[in-house]
């Protein structure tokens, strides 16, 4: 073989190798680019102040998603009420302004009146996911709010009436009470004059005497400083707080199976932990309130029973009035047989 022929063969092999290498690099680049393109970042907001009782479970959920979802899905947490007023969260989620929301049914009744029914649940979420209650509500969320109800992160957390004036019976005549839709029907039935404000305005309302009291769960008043302006808590508690993670359905439908799996895993963990976590939180804040000088008003047995009965009676009447189509059916799922 001549030297020229050998040179040509060698050069041909080198060119072929270079072409294969270039193709390999191109394929690798395409694969990497494709993998990176699959990661999606969702915008999230909370209806409650950051790092407070009713946002902490959501923030733990976000941390889990961002840890497990690297390269797959991430959540950009834009904040709480300073980023978006609580009563605007439902519509923002529905229209896709945000992809994920941590909110409560009381703040989304302007979009879906049935969402307030969660407060009346007498069964844990584990049971509602089996008896059809969750599925029934999930269908309404999809239809009315364009939302996926992912998980309930607050449960087993009773509401109470807090006052700055003592009462001896379940009668709020002459008192101005701050409310959200949670308590409106109940407190009005007890004779109260009701005033609706976002949580961020309650402290000032108490300080200035705009209201004489408010409804709120057993936990969380220390986060907001309300204990400084509160003298009494009325027992027994009633209803149960609900704070849940919702996902815009249009966004959800575009996610891959792997992305949905990351969200579902974090959501299921959070929901499974909620009951035990709030049992501990309830006990801790009950003691903390006593230590802070908040006195307990306790009705006698008959008055206490009447108080709770009226709470649920007026609560369900309100839900059924707002949603004749679904209210009675939701009650079947949520209530315990008497």
Language model features by range: what are they?
Residues 3-23:
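Bacterial N-terminal signal peptides that target proteins for export
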Residues 1-2, 12, 64, 114:
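Intrinsically disordered, low-complexity peptide-like regions
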Residues 4, 30-31:
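Intrinsic disorder/low-complexity segments
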Residues 134, 138:
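Divalent-metal coordination cores built from histidine and acidic residues
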Residues 23-26, 38-127, 139-338:
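N-terminal secretory/targeting leader peptides
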Residues 130:
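Active-site-adjacent segment of FAD-dependent monooxygenases/related oxidoreductases
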Residues 31-37:
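Sec/Tat signal peptide C-region and signal peptidase I cleavage site
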Residues 14, 29-30, 53:
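Alpha-helical transmembrane segments and their juxtamembrane interfaces
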